């Protein structure tokens, strides 16, 4: 069980709303960061076959889904102290053989993207809340393998 406060959930929700304010822009930041850190990750995402394209609805849709899952993770943590991931989500990550290092790259890209999205509203407290929500989501996905 993880203690996650209403305030932490609110911080994560606010960051998600900032991301949603310009999904195409922040999707590009997110996937560009992933590919800078781990170029081979391109092979994990079929929609990156032609590069990072903000007009690609699969790219923006996947980013929105991931960021939404982190927001949902925060809500689950506040409500119950744990996160449960859908078995299908675990299966996809298992099938693609996503490893711990790749989860870390995604977390770093998520944090960088949200930091840019919220601008001067970024704080250590927000960063901690986002990282905790993501880490618990990642653990739940791995558990669902």
UniProtKB/Swiss-Prot annotation:
Annotated signal sequence range: none
Top-level taxon: Eukaryota
Q: Where in the cell is it found?
A: Cytoplasm, Cytosol; Nucleus
- Binding of O2, residues: 62
Q: Which residues bind heme b?
A: 46, 65, 93, 96
Tissue-wise expression: Root nodules.
Q: Which family does it belong to?
A: Belongs to the plant globin family.
What assembly does the database describe for this protein?
A: Monomer.
Q: Kindly provide the name given to this protein in its UniProt entry.
A: Leghemoglobin-2
Question: What's the source species for this entry?
Answer: Vigna unguiculata (Cowpea)
The record's gene field reads LBII
């Amino acid at each position: 069980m993880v203690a996650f406060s209403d305030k932490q959930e609110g911080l994560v929700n606010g960051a998600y709303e900032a991301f949603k304010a310009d999904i195409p822009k922040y999707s590009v930041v997110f996937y560009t960061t992933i590919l800078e850190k781990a170029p081979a990750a391109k092979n994990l995402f079929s929609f990156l076959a032609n590069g990072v394209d903000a007009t690609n609805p699969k790219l923006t849709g996947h980013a929105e889904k991931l960021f939404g899952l982190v927001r949902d993770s925060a809500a689950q943590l506040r409500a119950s102290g744990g996160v449960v991931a859908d078995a299908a989500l675990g299966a996809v990550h298992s099938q693609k053989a996503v490893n711990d290092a790749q989860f870390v790259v995604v977390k770093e890209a998520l944090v960088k993207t949200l930091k840019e999205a919220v601008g001067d509203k970024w704080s250590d407290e927000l960063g901690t809340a986002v990282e905790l929500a993501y880490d618990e989501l990642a653990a739940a996905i791995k558990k669902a393998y």
